[in-house]
Amino acid sequence: MKPLLLLPLLGCLATIASCIDTVKWCVTSTKENLKCTALAAAAPVFSCVARASITDCLTAIKAGEADAITLDGGEIYTAGLDEYKLHPIIAEQYGTSTDTCYYAVAVAKKNTGFGLHQLMGKKSCHTGVGKSAGWNIPIGTLLSMDFIKWKGSDDKKLEEVVGEFFHSSCAPGATDSANLCKLCIGDCSKSSETEPYYNYHGAFQCLKDGKGDVAFVKHLTVPEEEKNDYELLCKDNTRKPIDQFENCDLAKVPSHAVVTRKDNEELAQFIWQSLSSVKNFNLFSSTPYGGKNLMFKDSTTTLVQLPLNVDHTMYLGPHYLESVKALKIVNIPSTTSDAMKWCAVGRSESDKCDSWSVASLVQDGTTIDCIKGNTVDDCLKKIMHKEADAMAVDGGQVYTAGKCGLVPAMVEQYDQGQCSAPGAARLYYAVAVIKKGSGVTWENLRNKRSCHTGIGRNAGWNIPMGLIYEQTKNCNFSAFFSSSCAPGADPSSQLCAQCAGNAESINKCKASNEERYYAYAGAFRCLAEGKGDVAFVKHSIVKENTDGQGPEWAKAFLSNDYELICPSKGPVSVENFMSCNLAKVNAHAVVTRPEIRTKVVTFLNNQQSHFGNSASEESFKMFTSPDGENLLFKYSTKCLQEIPAHLDYKGFLGQEYMTVMSSLRTCKESTSDLEQLCTYNMCQT
């Protein structure tokens, strides 16, 4: 999370194009407007904008007529669509833990004699159409369990199907089924307080008043003094007490969050600062205004700022998105695509992937769709969200992928002789390379210039910086070296000062092949071309890029001109990497989603039988790239081997490596925004 930056709220910086001095909060009811007006009186930085519904507020925020509103997960999904282009910036936190999730539950009165499997023909109370606990999760659950049968909107609108499933309902916001409004007592046409049975307290009141048989709410909705009169309906068709929600829920879902316009970091920061600076006003109490959950949920204990560049898909996570998308079927395809969606980073990888796709289609008709990502983290997000299926990454990126719910499926093997041995070790050594005679040692590295493969990568960052952190206990790595090239760092920092960009000197410090000094060969080139005093790479990289080997830029370099250094040893010959290295680490691995792991393994085994090093087909080689670059896979890869299905990322990386990473992750600068989000929002995994 971003720490609170205590900047003054008064006045405007000269660099700001348009002065932001007010947070215009959108409200959807008279009671909410009362609370907002009271907030504005206590903190004049706020003003209130009244609209008739949530969707009207989204339109107002997009147009700049309002700035912010707190939404539930289903509404966050809608807000993030192209129609509105809003994103979550602040999450509600409930209770004393750091958990920003809640449980969607089905509540019924005691002794009413039915379970979740017998809901057909019952009367239902919903918080609102499109809301998480009241609609998306319960309806998605009943669809997935095949109790509600729906072929998609080409057949019939979902609201019509749900209206036919239940005897009658109150589902505020329903427009396509009169039956879904039959139990309501106000204006059911809008998701707003104009309907008394709207939202959590309203849906529960609908049940309490005897209008409905079941209410779909969150786990904290039933008041403490009334819990003994109600029970939860579990997915296994049993019932449990209200307090046993962790063992009897429909789903764990992301908390409500404040949304605003995308691509306006300054506005997002101003909203956060404004909320953080509120004094003598309880943001999380609605009782004085005669309502419940006004502006924020009453059960909120604090607010948490989300990492920068988080969009609605990252915040909601793949499991919740799957539930929402299941409710929005427009066309039912007759068959599911068997294409493998491979994610490629940058133009060079995309070109190789396109060649692979053509070769595969010609060979046996297997379709490969090449999905382009800007960075590895961008590709990991695409895999999480089912926009891509797989990619090969280094160990540090396996760690991030694992934190985000992905699994390692296959690993690169660099020894041809071990390709027939399934349990063989797939390892390489992380080393520190210097120019011979430079006088650089491990002990005098401070204030030298450094070349790294990329932020978050194994040999180029995690291992060396982990060792440096163990020595210094200081996370300010940009101050340890005088200047560096560490692709993926802040382009304006000293960690990017030695980077060069591409041939046109653009994309400087980008974590892709568009940065000349990116990855193993790039970090060595940074050293060889005099941009750095030390390069952190893998043990084979010097031999692969000297003595006439490697791309054109490397032809004139000689391996004898370079040496290795390591703690308490060196300089030594580059041949002596086994006795002078920083660590022995796992090879690169292919990561994917758990549910398609077997599909990915089968696909890759088939592909390497056609295009691997030992295959006779010459039109395309999976592990070969122009000029010895590591495109899609490392150039030194001889084959891919399956990782046992029981091994998750922790088991694959090993305890020693996990310990190093835990230590390094003390430094937030070494943790990407993606990893911060994945470890922060545990609803995703």
Swiss-Prot record:
PANTHER family: SEROTRANSFERRIN, TRANSFERRIN. Gene3D superfamilies: Periplasmic binding protein-like II. Residues 1-16 form the signal peptide. GO terms for biological process: antibacterial humoral response; iron ion transport. Belongs to the transferrin family. Hydrogencarbonate 1 binds at residues 127, 131, 133-134. Fe(3+) 1 binds at residues 72, 102, 200, 256. Transmembrane segments: none annotated. Transferrins are iron binding transport proteins which can bind two Fe(3+) ions in association with the binding of an anion, usually bicarbonate. SMART domains: TR_FER. Keywords: Disulfide bond, Glycoprotein, Ion transport, Iron, Iron transport, Metal-binding, Repeat, Secreted, Signal, Transport. Hydrogencarbonate 2 binds at residues 453, 457, 459-460. One of its GO terms (cellular component) is recycling endosome. It holds the Pfam family Transferrin. Fe(3+) 2 binds at residues 394, 428, 520, 588. Residues 23-329, 340-666 form the Transferrin-like domain. Glycans are attached at residue 476. It is found in: Secreted. InterPro entries: Transferrin (IPR016357), Transferrin-like_dom (IPR001156), Transferrin_Fe_BS (IPR018195). Monomer. This is Serotransferrin. The gene is tf.
